[in-house]
Amino acid sequence: MRDFQRSDPSPLGDPSLELTAFVGRSAELRGLAEALETARLVTLTGMGGVGKSRLAAHAAARTDPREGAWRVELSAVRDPDLVEYAVVEALGLTDHTSRPPRRVLLDHFAERQLLLVLDGFEHLVDACASLVGELLRHAPGLRVLAVGRRPLDVAGERLFPLAPLTEPEAAELFADRAAARVPGFALDDGNRSDVRELCRRLEGIPLAIELAAGRLSALSPAQLLARLEDRFRLLIGGARDALPRHHTLRTAIGWSHELCTP
């Protein structure tokens, strides 16, 4: 008899319901989906704002575990001791025996086939590595996609580093997001060179490009480019429902630098 049950489960969202287009990344998407088919632990690494979370969601949607894919957002978890509780909560598990959360998870995963996505684990790497290692050893049907800026360094881990967008992809992303702010916007002979240079100066980082495109209602591509010297101050804004660490380029980079502090 099971002593726990699901309550308000939180499976991975359907990428087809996203409100903005998923631009580029076709090769990376194929590669990551293939990695998830051949390795039980895949860690998607890359700098802040490079698009790891969205790629992970699309790749996870291509997998076909019997009980689906489940995502745990860890960026807001500051205490390593709360990692296991965060996973229990994301899975919607309610335990009625006062067992430790790790035991609840071990029992839950023991005979299930599913994909667990741990997103934003980099500041909790030791706690996550310990949990993932034990879960994989005791749950043969479990696969894990870890998403962060560093490896977990767990046995059997397959790394999948994510680079910034290519120049054509970056320009396409800028044009798509700009058209949402300025109806009818499109790349043409009058703005193409400025947009390409803008994306190059932003190093192909999707978050930075989206924030820049969001300023297009007030500034032209040429004006954005001219003011890019102070890019941290310029790129202020972002969607209200974005993660706190993604509201500004300054915050995204600050989040990355925080991880380097002893």
Positions of the model-derived regions?
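Aliphatic-rich helical/repeat scaffold segments used for oligomerization and domain docking
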Residues: M1-P262
